[in-house]
């Protein structure tokens, strides 16, 4: 017996989207959580973030690093950017899935329309 329907091609975008997301997350976290490359102290005592040491003959006080140095993890925008990255990855995967499954011809839009971002969901 001859099949009358053509099988659909499986969605192969999700591994790429996941890989790009993980690499982006790794790069973002490695840039946003930089450690200071120098440590303060002497040849015996190391204070990477400042500190105080006192013994019988020596008293050392090194200043703490600023919590805002390198625009690090003290930024309040970190969660916002991670959520935005995740939502954009879901958007790309969803549009790719819908176009491959034949539910849309493509996510094209008329440039004169105002709501072209939501055309994919109609």
Swiss-Prot record:
Cytoplasmic side: 1-12, 98-122
Annotated organism of origin: Peanut clump virus (isolate 87/TGTA2) (PCV)
Keywords of this entry: Host cell junction, Host cytoplasm, Host cytoskeleton, Host endoplasmic reticulum, Host membrane, Membrane, Transmembrane, Transmembrane helix, Transport, Viral movement protein
GO biological process: transport of virus in host, cell to cell
Function summary: Participates in the transport of viral genome to neighboring plant cells directly through plasmodesmata, without any budding. TGBp2 and TGBp3 are necessary for intracellular delivery of TGBp1-containing vRNPs to plasmodesmata. Can gate plasmodesmata and increase their size exclusion limit. To a lesser extent than TGB3, induces host actin cytoskeleton network thickening, which probably plays a major role in virus cell-to-cell movement.
A Gene Ontology term for the protein's cellular component: host cell endoplasmic reticulum membrane
Assembly behavior: Interacts with movement protein TGB3. TGB1-TGB3-TGB2 complex formation is enhanced by ATP hydrolysis.
One Pfam family named in its UniProt record: Plant_vir_prot
Organism ancestry: Viruses, Riboviria, Orthornavirae, Kitrinoviricota, Alsuviricetes
InterPro entries listed in its UniProt record: Plant_vir_prot (IPR001896)
Membrane topology, record value: Multi-pass membrane protein
Protein name (database record): Movement protein TGB2
């Amino acid at each position: 017996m001859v099949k009358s329907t053509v099988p659909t091609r499986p969605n192969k975008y999700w591994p790429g989207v996941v890989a790009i997301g993980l690499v982006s997350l790794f790069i973002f976290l490695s840039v946003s959580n930089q450690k200071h490359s120098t440590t303060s102290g002497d040849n015996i005592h190391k204070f990477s973030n400042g500190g105080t040491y006192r013994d019988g003959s020596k008293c050392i006080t090194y200043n703490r690093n600023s919590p805002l140095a390198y625009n690090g993890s003290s930024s309040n925008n970190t969660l916002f950017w991670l959520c935005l990255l995740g939502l954009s990855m879901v958007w790309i995967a969803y549009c790719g899935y819908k176009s491959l499954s034949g539910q849309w011809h493509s996510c094209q839009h008329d440039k004169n329309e105002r709501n072209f971002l939501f055309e994919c969901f109609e």
